[in-house]
Amino acid sequence: MTGRFIVLEGIDGCGKTTQIQHLLEWLPNSGLMPKGAAVVCTREPGGTPLGRSIRELLLHTSDQEAPAPTAELMLYAADRAQHVETLIRPALERGDWVISDRFSGSTLAYQGYGRGLDRDLIQRLEQIATAGLQPDITLWLRLSVQESLQRRLGDKEDRIEAEGAAFLERVAQGFAQLAEHRSWCAVAADQSASAVRAALERQLQEHLA
């Protein structure tokens, strides 16, 4: 029995964390999952013990040396390779359902579009790190940069979040293009939380039933 792999993507402040918590409660009672399957919740970066150390290197905001853009890309790839091999693929092989807060699309959006790194290189690294594993469904929570900045006003920012509006605009453009080219399911994240929940449930019922 093979499980299902669900990914939520979107710019900072789009509400992924809130919606994932809802899906953790909703999925086991949705009628979608087979009997005996569990829901595994994870994230990138930082879904494994090794990944948590990598996450600290990637996102810290101290005065320590920050990773150069290419080094940053390699760290994300290392995190993903460990994540897929030690957590995601074993869970799917057990028949469990995996929900991940971000996956390879975020690397293309943030490092490819945001940083301007070679997207062909990023896609080659993606193939290596994932060993060909792809989500069964990617749910893109679409949010404007203006709304993202407003929602996060006053919040403590990590190193990536602190990049500013111009960087985030490029990232948002990247997500939009990826959603089109990879047939992601787009959900407007500027609605009420309950409306977003209902839209996500509809997408999952439609695509995974």
Swiss-Prot record:
Function in brief: Phosphorylation of dTMP to form dTDP in both de novo and salvage pathways of dTTP synthesis.
InterPro entries: P-loop_NTPase, Thymidylate_kin-like_dom, Thymidylate_kin_CS, Thymidylate_kinase
Enzyme nomenclature, EC number: 2.7.4.9
Sequence similarity: Belongs to the thymidylate kinase family.
Any one Gene Ontology molecular-function term assigned to this protein's record: dTMP kinase activity
Name of the protein described by the UniProt record: Thymidylate kinase
Positions bound to ATP: 10-17
Reactions the enzyme catalyzes: dTMP + ATP = dTDP + ADP
GO terms of biological process kind: dTDP biosynthetic process; dTTP biosynthetic process; dUDP biosynthetic process
Keyword rRNA processing recorded: no
Top enzyme category: transferase
